[in-house]
Amino acid sequence: MRRFDTLFSQLQQKQQGAFVPFVTLCDPNLAQSFEIIQTLVENGADALELGFPFSDPMLDGPVIQAANQRALVAGCSTDASFQLLTQVRSTYPTLPISLLLCANLVYAQGIERFYQRCAEVGVDAVLIADLPLFAHREFTVMAEKYSIQQVFICPPNACEDTIKRVAQQTQGYTYLVSRSGVTGVENQQSADNLKTLVERLKAYQAPPILQGFGISQPQQVSDVLKIGVNGAISGSATVQIIEKYHHDPQACLAELAQFTQKMKQATT
């Protein structure tokens, strides 16, 4: 059984939701990034969603854009990101790991080579934020070849056909976006139709649903679980802690530990 499948099965038995933090690899630098990831996992993160530093990220608000810049200024490269992933996987052999990135980064490596490298370092799933449903085939063919689960986004304004196609094509989990726009904790509003979207996705037997965008408080985690999703992804709120404390590594790790514990507690 694949790692995400195993995770959701275990959480269902425990009657828990998943808490999945997002961070940018190598933010603020390679060494601190690994310590940050360790802290997240050791304090309750059920899985990780990780980004590769990129100069023009899609969907990212100012907080995650700044994280990309910190990593790039520190000299992080795609090779360094894969190196860090190797270290994470060797430390946590059962941890589900998903990548969230842009198509241009994949193209820069070559599609097949990118998925091959993902498989070599133990990545479980890949979500390409700017990959349209109608243009996914060359990516999903390579994902299947290297046993990588290709994840797709269900937007809040999805029509019935889009909901059906997302449910049928996404693997590992379904990424449900809380609202339109870019990531960020400033806008914590959610679309009014999310409960209906969850019901429709489940009607088409979509993989477990993780909701993301604007989730920064434990109460929000509890609230999204009540509408039937299987877990919550928190990116900007997690990265904001790194932004605030990256010059004080110990304070950064302490704040991240406390944040992760509270967010995970809200899934029970």
Curated annotation (Swiss-Prot):
E.C. no: 4.2.1.20
PROSITE patterns linked to this entry: TRP_SYNTHASE_ALPHA (PS00167)
Alphabetically ordered keywords of this record: Amino-acid biosynthesis, Aromatic amino acid biosynthesis, Lyase, Tryptophan biosynthesis
Catalytic residue positions: E49 (proton acceptor), D60 (proton acceptor)
Catalytic function, reaction form: (1S,2R)-1-C-(indol-3-yl)glycerol 3-phosphate + L-serine = D-glyceraldehyde 3-phosphate + L-tryptophan + H2O
Keyword Lyase: yes
Pfam families, per the entry: Trp_syntA
The protein's annotated pathway: Amino-acid biosynthesis; L-tryptophan biosynthesis; L-tryptophan from chorismate: step 5/5
Any one of the GO CC terms: cytosol
GO MF, one example: tryptophan synthase activity
Entry function: The alpha subunit is responsible for the aldol cleavage of indoleglycerol phosphate to indole and glyceraldehyde 3-phosphate.
Assembly information from the UniProt record: Tetramer of two alpha and two beta chains.
Family to which this protein belongs: Belongs to the TrpA family.
Name of protein: Tryptophan synthase alpha chain
Species assigned in the record: Pasteurella multocida (strain Pm70)
